[in-house]
Design a protein with these regions (language model features):
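Disorder-to-helix initiation segments
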Residues: 1-13, 92
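Heptad-repeat coiled-coil alpha-helices
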Residues: 26, 30-33, 63, 70, ...
Length: 116
């Protein structure tokens, strides 16, 4: 199969970018505290950027004759980014740290994609 490793990494990105988008949404919805007014609109920017990347990656995968994941089940079954339940037991700083971890993972995955 042509570009098999590239397609694999791109599809992993599809699953993980989808998961990251949901984590950003969750952070956006469950945010509270003194930095709310600054951070809440920033989450909108993060969501837009992740959604844009997801679209570009999916279209690139299609251009390579690949099949991007396109169901919630496929995303959930294939993501490597851990999710949290939607509850109020996490603080905003904890949620932001979770975002940072997700972005670091994505950075490594993009680098891996460049190398294959």
């Amino acid at each position: 199969m042509k570009y098999a490793k590239t397609k694999e990494v791109l599809n992993q990105l599809v699953a993980d970018l989808s998961q990251m988008s949901m984590i950003i949404h969750q952070t956006h919805w469950y945010m509270r505290g003194p930095n709310f007014l600054k951070l809440h609109p920033l989450m909108d920017e993060f969501m837009e950027e992740i959604d844009s990347q997801l679209d570009v990656i999916s279209e690139r995968l299609i251009a390579l004759d690949g099949n991007p994941y396109s169901t919630l089940k496929e995303m959930a079954d294939n993501t490597k980014i851990k999710d949290w339940p939607g509850t109020w037991d996490k603080t905003t700083p904890e949620r932001l740290a979770h975002l940072v971890d997700g972005y670091r993972y994505l950075e490594d995955l993009y680098q891996h994609g460049i190398e294959v």
